[in-house]
Amino acid sequence: MIDNLKKILNEDQDPKAIEKITSKLENLLMSNEEVGYIAVQKKPAITVFPDSVVVTNKRIILCKPKNLGLSMEFVDYDWDDIAGTFVKEGLLGSDFIFSTKTELTHTVDYLPKNQARKLYTYAKEQLDLLKNGVATPNVNLVPDTELEAQVEEI
């Protein structure tokens, strides 16, 4: 988990916000559950109490500060319950949207674009893993024209 967090902190993340979230998440994670990515809201003016989204290999966790930041509300959704994930990019940031199989839609707005893209990519990988049983490898396909040229040479 520490290695993942070091990688996340290199991507314009607020170290204090990440540290606060991870300290509270440690007691919430199930056995064999690993944090894949954490995205923290960054509103245009001042973000005093940002919402955040944590994606793990087992679920999506929404973290919302309550009572002037003195407490935190966690709402989680297992990957089995997720129907799809989406990213909508705007001028001041991106929205990460996911819908459940019971047709509930959740949106976290004002995420930095880079963070929203990484969140979306990780979510798609987890949904693909759940759907197909294995993650699809990144295969560089050779165009048919190159294959035909190789066949003619033989």
Regions found by a protein language model. Give the residues of each.
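A short, Trp-centered hydrophobic/proline-enriched beta-strand micro-motif
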Residues: 33-38
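Conserved beta-hairpin
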Residues: 41-72
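Acidic, Ser/Thr- and proline-rich intrinsically disordered linker/docking segments
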Residues: 1-13, 17-29, 43-48, 70-154
